[in-house]
């Protein structure tokens, strides 16, 4: 192309798949097109903006009639913008009949006997017959010899398999924790990307592989409760920590005609930092995780709970939260500040470890114990008057207190003529150079305006010399200095 030629302008008529700007452009156009129908189709517009995930629409309704009405409006809005929404799937036969077989999504094989009843929803699978979410863990692109345990995988292959398990709500938290701790151990060993794992990591890897077959059997109801919108609802967040991990998990507590019911919302597990930390600090980090989980749940739901309860089995953490956080060290103080910005003091309660479901997200899974991670603690299904959780004595509030430093400066002798601190420095150091360096370091610590450096420079030493000279003059000419400061005359013979 000749630089002197006139520039030619090209305009794209459609969004190009794969361009860096494509996701943002697609979302903007989708929302902008929907907003033009805000007055005529308010429910449909709200669904398009809030319930669209790229090109997938995931929504739920309280009745079949409202579902058909809103979806028809959504289809109409997209059609006027040049988009075609199709491949619907629902647990309602009436809904599927209205939209016809040609618009219903093709079945995805999950189980040989019930393959036609399973549909993929954002990485998970929905069984339309039982209205439950499940998992199908397929690793078709990964060498089969890894799963047959005939070959030890490399670090890269382990990471690839672990990241293939998509669990956005933490349903498989007890299983994913094994994988997270395995990856942490591999990193600590400094294993190369293409080097086979070794030692105890092999045993833990095989244990995790075998547990995946149990994970595929997990099912969780899509709907929290049929009467969730008609009765008062409560949000309960539990948090816990151990030496190896910390976790948070949330549940709805719903009152129905048959009594109280708890429904799993989501959970989160994280490995403890490789740098050693105390259990109270990890428990505090779990409380921060629970606070962030609370915010995520409230922002992601249209339901406004009647009350929110935060539960921890650490009496020390509860004591920190309910005391003045400014007296604690920065690590504790900053995290308590984040907790109190999003929660109230009265929201926090103590729960025994045996009744804390978050405990199951902090320890390696054991096939012999019954888990309450998905169903919640038993006491949530009882009336609050029957809760017998024991007493929560105040924990140790002396931990993590800021150290109190007392700096004694400018202490004078009884006659006021000698600075005691300076005199001790003169008597302690016989080397002038060493004395100057000590004075420079002390002055830097006292003056917070000075930018902290890891070394002394010439300016610091010169300032130290002036300080020493002033103090020597103050000792040798104390009376004259006092007279000048008070405006008195000095005798000529002095």
What do the PLM-derived regions correspond to, one by one?
Residues 1-10, 25-39, 127-144, 150-152, ...:
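Reverse-transcriptase-like RNA-dependent polymerase core
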Residues 6-29, 158, 254-285, 323:
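A short, polar/acidic, helix/strand-boundary loop motif
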Residues 11, 48, 78, 114-229, ...:
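C-terminal reverse transcriptase regions that engage the nucleic-acid substrate
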Residues 23-69, 73, 292-310:
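Active-site palm subdomain of RNA-directed nucleic acid polymerases
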Residues 46-81, 93-102, 316-329:
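Catalytic palm subdomain of template-directed nucleic-acid polymerases
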Residues 51, 92, 289-353, 357, ...:
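RNase H catalytic domain
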Residues 99-163, 340-356, 360-494:
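Flexible, low-complexity interdomain linkers flanking nucleic-acid-processing modules
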Residues 233, 237-263:
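Acidic, metal-ligating active-site segments
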């Amino acid at each position: 192309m000749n630089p002197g030629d006139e520039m030619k302008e090209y305009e794209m008529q459609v969004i190009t798949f794969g361009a860096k700007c494509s996701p943002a452009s697609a979302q903007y156009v989708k929302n902008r097109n929907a907003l033009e129908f805000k007055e005529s189709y308010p429910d449909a517009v709200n669904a398009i903006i809030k319930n669209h995930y790229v090109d997938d629409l995931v929504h739920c309704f309280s009745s079949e009639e409202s579902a058909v009405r809103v979806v028809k409006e959504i289809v109409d809005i997209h059609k006027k913008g040049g988009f075609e929404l199709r491949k619907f799937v629902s647990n309602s036969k009436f809904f599927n009949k209205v939209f016809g077989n040609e618009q219903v999504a093709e079945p995805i094989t999950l189980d040989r006997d019930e393959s036609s009843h399973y549909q993929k929803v954002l990485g998970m699978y929905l069984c339309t017959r039982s209205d439950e979410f499940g998992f199908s863990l397929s690793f078709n692109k990964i060498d089969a010899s890894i799963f047959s345990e005939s070959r030890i995988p490399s670090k890269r292959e382990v990471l690839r398999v672990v990241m293939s398990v998509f669990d956005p709500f933490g349903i498989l938290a007890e299983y994913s924790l094994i994988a997270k701790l395995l990856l942490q151990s591999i990193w600590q060993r400094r294993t190369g990307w293409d080097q086979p794992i070794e030692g105890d990591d092999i045993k833990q890897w095989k244990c995790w592989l075998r547990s995946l077959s149990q994970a595929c059997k997990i099912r969780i109801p899509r709907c929290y409760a049929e009467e969730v919108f008609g009765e008062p609802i409560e949000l309960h967040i539990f948090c816990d920590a151990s030496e190896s991990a910390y976790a948070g998990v949330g549940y709805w507590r719903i009152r129905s005609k048959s009594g109280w019911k708890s429904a799993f919302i989501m959970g989160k597990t994280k490995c403890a930092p490789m740098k050693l930390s105390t259990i109270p600090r990890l428990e505090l980090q779990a409380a921060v995780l629970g606070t962030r989980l609370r915010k995520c749940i409230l922002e992601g739901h249209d339901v406004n709970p009647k009350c929110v309860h935060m539960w921890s089995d650490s009496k020390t953490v509860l004591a920190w939260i309910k005391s003045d956080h400014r007296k604690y060290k920065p690590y504790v103080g900053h995290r308590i500040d984040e907790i109190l910005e999003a929660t109230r003091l009265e929201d926090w309660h103590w729960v025994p470890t045996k009744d804390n479901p978050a405990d199951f997200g902090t320890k390696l899974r054991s096939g012999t114990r019954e888990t309450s991670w998905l169903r919640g603690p038993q006491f949530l299904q009882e009336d609050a008057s029957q809760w017998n959780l024991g007493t929560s004595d105040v924990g140790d509030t002396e931990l993590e207190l800021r150290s109190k430093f007392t700096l004694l400066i400018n202490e004078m002798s009884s006659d006021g003529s000698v600075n005691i601190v300076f005199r001790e420095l003169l008597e302690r150091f016989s080397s002038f150079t060493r004395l100057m360096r000590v004075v420079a370091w002390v002055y830097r610590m006292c003056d917070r305006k000075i930018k902290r450096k890891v070394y002394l420079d010439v300016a610091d030493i010169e300032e130290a010399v002036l300080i020493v000279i002033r103090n020597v003059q103050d000792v040798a000419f104390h009376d004259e200095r006092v007279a000048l400061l008070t405006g008195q005359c000095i005798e000529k013979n002095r």
